[in-house]
Amino acid sequence: MAAAHSWVDHFLIAMPSLADPHFFRGVTLVCQHDAEGAMGLVLNHPSDFTMGEVLRQMDIPGAAPALARQPVLLGGPVQRDRGFVLHEDARDFGPSLRFGHGLAISTSREILEALARGDGPADFVMALGYAGWGAGQLEEEIVQNSWLTVPAERAIIFDTPIERRWQAAAGVLGIDISGVSDSVGHA
């Protein structure tokens, strides 16, 4: 059974009042959403790891310096020991969740090896962990004004610097998120 409205391929933009450190000033891409719950990746919280460190830990040699320096994100509080590679869905890299308009999440070693060889997807983001919501939880958080929503834009995912993604996603709505009040509905 599908959810009444699917937020797949949308950004969840954390309101300034959302204090949970996993989502504070966060922009999350919803990758799966149905009646059973939702799954997404936080796109603007860097971890302490780089791609080079992840590849070394997995004994995958040959990463070019630019790839090795690329930051790995904290994708959310669930399964932080597991890597998720968000990329354009141009090739099959083993088990993948395909969603939206040509995006996929792959968790296989194969995609990491392809990236290290230089024949992986040109545009990708790697995250450790993901954000998950139970049945109806995301909808309730949206009703409670924890999130703004907007259709996802590839340029924000792949081309915008990490530290600018929250503002850029809100900018799609034509607002300066830093000027949004933490208090809503009080006269």
Whereabouts are the PLM-identified features?
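A short aromatic-anchored loop/beta-hairpin motif
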Residues: 1-126, 130-187
